[in-house]
């Protein structure tokens, strides 16, 4: 990727997630100062105060870029299933509209979830050759037997060939030209309407099923999922993925680093670093006090039993040296 090339970044948020979005964007700008960055934030609507805060990110530290807010309103989302107890909202499906919402002269964009920290340059990732593919993303599995089995279960449920693979939709490089030419957005909504019972993982299932073999898999360092370090996973880690410094850290577990009562957490130091650097340095999460207290007590019980909410082993210690 040439330095003068604009890097187009897309994310989505509501008022509740604005702090996470802002902290993620701070880490993005801080680690990619050599490029002009245009950020497009998809939202159903946020307060004027939050709108101003997000817009001020680029001005505060003289970052080289701009932030646009794209209001999403589309009746097709009425057909997108959100079940009782799901930990996502209909906003998970907003990424279906990225090629329509972004200016038509933009041919490539990188989508990032908000529970992410950018820990290095995205230049090589953004320069990925996208010839004849729609999306470049990281495999949901990490090459070990457990996550490979889970991915195969997803593929079997969706009913497509295993060789097409299954990716995580938290980080996606999008070929918008291909997407528009092949009318992928129409195919995605049509699939959801016909197969809502199959889409256990919402937009991620839909994207994997519809895109078929038009996906390209990228190194795991571009979507390093902290779920690897949760209790019980210590024997599942594939040593291969620990050989490179994580560039994008994805905090994709139920327990998050911004839940202040945890003494430690994989890559919490990075998240705290960018929180303190951001306009949300005093933010400590949205959970009400009763819920915070409940989680503190659970953590204390684990400690009393000689256990940790998050496990640490030699693999984790190796990674901390690459932080």
State the predicted function of each range.
Residues 56-100:
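Active-site-proximal specificity loops/subdomain of glycosyltransferases
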């Amino acid at each position: 990727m040439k330095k003068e090339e604009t890097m187009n970044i897309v994310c989505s948020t509501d008022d509740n997630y604005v702090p996470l979005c802002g902290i993620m964007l701070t880490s993005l700008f801080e680690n990619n100062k050599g490029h002009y960055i245009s950020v497009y934030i998809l939202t159903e609507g946020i307060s004027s105060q939050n709108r101003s805060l997000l817009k001020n990110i680029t001005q505060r530290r003289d970052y080289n870029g701009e932030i646009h807010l794209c209001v999403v309103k589309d009746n097709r989302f009425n057909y997108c299933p959100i079940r009782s107890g799901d930990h996502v909202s209909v906003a998970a499906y907003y990424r279906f509209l990225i090629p329509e919402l972004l200016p038509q002269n933009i041919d490539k964009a990188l989508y990032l979830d908000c529970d992410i920290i950018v820990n290095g340059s995205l230049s090589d990732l953004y320069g990925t050759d996208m010839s004849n593919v729609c999306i470049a993303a990281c495999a949901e599995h990490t090459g070990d037997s457990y996550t490979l089995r889970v991915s195969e279960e997803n593929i079997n449920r969706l009913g497509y060939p295993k060789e097409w693979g299954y990716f995580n939709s938290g980080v996606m490089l999008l070929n918008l030209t291909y997407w528009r030419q092949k009318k992928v957005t129409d195919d995605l909504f049509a699939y959801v309407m016909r197969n809502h019972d199959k889409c256990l993982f919402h937009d991620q299932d839909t994207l994997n099923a519809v895109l078929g073999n038009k996906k390209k898999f990228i190194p795991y360092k571009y979507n390093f999922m902290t779920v690897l370090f949760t209790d019980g996973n210590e024997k599942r880690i594939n040593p291969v993925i620990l050989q490179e410094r994580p560039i994008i850290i994805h905090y994709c577990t139920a327990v998050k680093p911004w839940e202040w009562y945890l003494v430690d957490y994989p890559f919490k130091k990075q998240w705290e670093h960018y929180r303190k650097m951001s306009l949300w340095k005093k933010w400590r999460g949205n959970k009400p006090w009763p819920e915070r207290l409940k989680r503190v007590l659970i953590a204390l019980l684990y400690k009393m039993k000689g256990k940790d909410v998050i496990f640490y082993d030699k693999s984790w210690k190796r990674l901390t040296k690459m932080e």
